[in-house]
Amino acid sequence: MAVWAIGDVHGCRELLEGLWEEISPGPGDTVVLLGDLIDRGPDPAGVLWFVRERARTGRVVALRGNHEDLCLRWHRARSEADRGLWMANAGYTTLESYGFAPGDPAAELPAEDLAFLQAMPLWHREEGVVFVHAGLRPGVPLEEQDPEDLLWIRDEFYRHPEAFRERIVFGHTPFRRVLRNGPLVGIDTGAVYGGCLTAYEPFEERVVQVGAEDGGRFAW
């Protein structure tokens, strides 16, 4: 039974579909998406639909990323300043994928997709491996981590592998290739920026990638 982690998708539905076909998860397998399914790319709405449909019939864990969190805050916001933060982080691309024009006051995610985002956990642990969007604050137990760190932390986390014993698989910070730094494995390889969308199986150390620009598929 495999456990596949998938890095930041950012609206790249075609890449996600291609990668899913490559890893071909079976009935006993688990797929953990590390957050940031939405924003920036061409089809955030399609990505959410694709993941929701697979979650109905298979073991799929979709973690909350900082972009999902910004989206939820936008839907709760009461001031224009609060609402502007998601737009400044490419939230408009998600609304446009649902057919809303920029600035449409009626724009919002469908109730089913909004509920899906609200139910996303901040982390997942599977057989001693921790999966999280951005990372962990060194010296703080997993259960006591600040949600802001789980969603946003960068250098203070991945530059300090000596602070962690468990394998931690994370996204959020894009790298040209999979980052292996002690027990830390970063698999956001910048799909939406012309890189690859990466799937990683930590128990067998398998990596499968679908290339954004040339359609190439790589596995090792």
Per-segment meaning from a language model:
Residues 146-220:
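Acidic, His/Gly-rich catalytic cores of divalent-metal-dependent hydrolytic chemistry
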Residues 8, 36, 51, 65-66, ...:
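Divalent metal-coordination and catalytic microenvironments
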Residues 1-48:
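N-terminal active-site segment of His-dependent metallophosphoesterases
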Residues 107-132, 137, 142-177:
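His/acidic metal-ligating clusters that form di-metal
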Residues 40-122, 153, 157-159:
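Active-site neighborhood of divalent metal-dependent phosphoester bond hydrolases
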Residues 5, 31-33, 62-63, 130, ...:
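Residue-level marker for buried hydrophobic side chains located in beta-strands
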Residues 2-10, 129-135, 185-187:
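Active-site-proximal beta-strand elements of phosphoester/diester hydrolases
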Residues 10-14, 39-42, 69-72, 138-139, ...:
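Active-site environment of divalent metal-dependent phosphoester hydrolases
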